[in-house]
Design a protein with these regions (language model features):
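Helix C-cap/helix->beta junction micro-motif
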Residues: 218, 281-282, 312, 440, ...
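PLP-dependent enzyme catalytic core of the Aspartate aminotransferase-like
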Residues: 425-428, 435-444, 449-482
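Conserved glycine-rich beta-strand-loop-beta hairpin in the small C-terminal domain of fold type I
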Residues: 368, 384-394, 406-420, 454
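N-terminal small-domain helix-loop-helix segment of the aminotransferase-like
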Residues: 84-182, 189, 373, 481-482
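Conserved core of the PLP fold type I
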Residues: 146-277, 294-295, 302-307, 311
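Conserved core segment of the aminotransferase class I/II
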Residues: 309-387, 394-395, 399, 472
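Local cysteine-cluster metal-coordination motifs and their immediate loop/turn environment
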Residues: 4-15, 36-51, 66-74
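Immediate flanking context of iron-sulfur cluster ligation sites
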Residues: 2-5, 23-40, 59-65
Length: 482
């Protein structure tokens, strides 16, 4: 064996390193990936590594081939691990002010008699959140005065500890943290500092519809750099297209989404480094939406954009929130992390100009409750449940919905279905497909506002029994072969 032969080109992992990992006890692809980073998020390298591992295991008479070839996030593994928190109870949210269950995002279409609604559209989870959130809110409401207040030190300490524990962020201080009513408000405030109205701003498409509305409503000209799917179906940044647009259109501000919504990509370090190097080269200021950074599926790791270089740290406004992680959108409350003091002062001033950007006392206590150790534990279990749901849906689509294409998300709990081929083969429009799903109670979301022309966006953050029921209905009533 040539131990110097490079098996994984992306991370320059050699045959010798993989062999050593196996000798150290790694008996599955997942274990080798942890030890060497080999094949991480790279389809071509993953296949090479698996094939090379099979040869080593066979040579050493180690029986475990199914571990080598299995896809990440196996349900059988998860089912052997008991859950402390409840992700199986079906909550009745009707009449509780939840648009996810009380609204249908399509006009002139109703659910047929005999079908109940399965909410799979807006990014809102149908799980009970961690108990410490409710406990923190209830404890504060017992003190029956809710007047003007100052954020307590515990609020900042909770954020600092959360970022250190989950994202390995060292050296974060209270001064770098600022409140934002919402991530989109923070995006606009940062752009108002970086740009003048009418300036061009780079986004990668498919694009979160909230970005589109926020930027257009505030007078910015959006320039899209489309992501491309590689031969393994993984969404990739088109660096050539990105650089060309930055250079030719003189763009000096960008909104970056990490993990990406709606595609679900969890960017690798080399991708972030290359993106930020282009932004440095063309003097582009960056707003990084990292609201999904806690929802990372099995086998992947979130890397904060600001962490990849000192320059990235100084030119980036990063936005986070507990709202997506713990289903707290109705309470309002996000925060920014800005290390550059000049930018930080200007963003905070911009955010305060309309007097809208004021923290809610219950929102503050909700974050403190969410970011407790119990919250860390709850998110860990949540991500296992979501990984299982994603695996189930992805495999079901590939097996049953011929002509429907989908990339397996690495983060978030949203699927983006591409129905182009299916619609062409069955002479159907995407409107007809969407209507057929809603009529049988699968309340999903039109992908076109996300720049997915024949796409459908689906939320998988609900108990598995509902996910299975939804896909059974789609198979029987929507994508059934004639």
């Amino acid at each position: 064996m040539n131990r110097e032969k490079v098996i994984c080109a992306c991370h320059h992992v050699t045959a010798g390193e993989i062999e050593d990992a196996v000798k150290d006890g790694a008996a599955s692809f997942k274990e080798v990936k942890k030890l060497t980073k080999a094949g991480k998020s790279c389809g071509k390298c993953k296949k090479k590594v698996k094939k090379f591992m099979e040869a080593i295991l066979e040579e050493q008479n180690i029986e475990n081939p199914e571990c080598v070839c299995a896809e990440p996030g196996r349900d059988a593994e998860r089912e052997t691990q008991p859950m402390k928190y409840d992700f199986t109870t079906i909550m009745d949210r009707r009449g509780k002010d939840a648009i996810a269950v009380d609204e249908i995002p399509f006009e002139n279409v109703e659910v047929k008699e005999g079908f109940d609604r399965i909410p799979m559209w807006v990014a809102d989870m149908n799980f009970q959140t961690v108990p410490t959130v409710a406990e923190a809110i209830i404890e504060r409401t017992k003190h029956r005065a809710y007047g003007y207040f100052m954020p307590r030190e515990e609020y900042y300490d909770a954020i600092i500890n959360w970022q250190k524990t989950r994202n390995h962020v060292e050296g974060l201080t209270k001064e770098c943290i600022g409140y934002e009513n919402g991530v989109l408000g923070g995006v606009v405030s940062a752009l108002n500092v970086f740009c003048s109205r009418g300036d061009k701003v780079l986004l990668h498409s498919p694009t979160y519809v909230g970005f589109t509305h926020a930027l257009e409503n505030n007078g910015y000209d959006i320039v899209h750099s489309p992501l491309k799917r590689d031969e393994d179906g993984i969404w990739r940044i088109d660096f050539e297209d990105m650089e060309q647009k930055l250079k030719e259109q003189h763009i000096h501000a960008a909104v970056f989404c990490s993990p990406h919504n709606p595609c679900g990509r969890v960017w690798e370090r080399w991708e972030l480094e290359r993106v930020m190097e282009l932004y440095r080269k063309y003097d582009v200021m960056v707003v990084s939406d990292e609201i999904w950074s806690d929802i990372i599926l099995d086998g992947y790791t979130h890397i904060p954009t600001q962490s990849v270089s000192e320059d990235a740290k100084q030119r980036t406004v990063a936005l986070y929130a507990p709202s997506k992680t713990f289903n707290l959108a109705g309470l309002i409350g996000s925060y920014h992390i800005i290390y550059n003091p000049q930018i930080r002062d200007r963003v905070m001033k911009e955010s305060s100009l309309s007097h809208y950007n004021m923290m809610n006392v219950l929102s503050m206590h909700a974050l403190i409750g969410a970011y407790k150790p119990e919250g860390q534990e709850w998110v860990g279990e949540l991500c296992k449940v979501l990984s299982g749901n994603v695996d189930y849906a992805w495999n079901y689509i590939r097996e049953h919905f011929k002509g429907v294409s989908v990339s397996r998300p690495q983060g978030t709990y949203m699927l983006l279905l591409d129905c182009t081929q299916w619609c062409e083969e069955h002479k159907k429009t995407i409107d007809e497909v969407q209507r057929a799903g809603v009529e049988v109670g699968v309340i999903w979301q039109d992908g076109r506002p996300f720049h997915s022309p024949c796409g459908i966006r689906m939320n998988l953050a609900l108990p598995r029994v509902l996910v299975e029921e939804a896909f059974d209905r789609l198979n029987k009533y929507v994508f059934a072969e004639c």
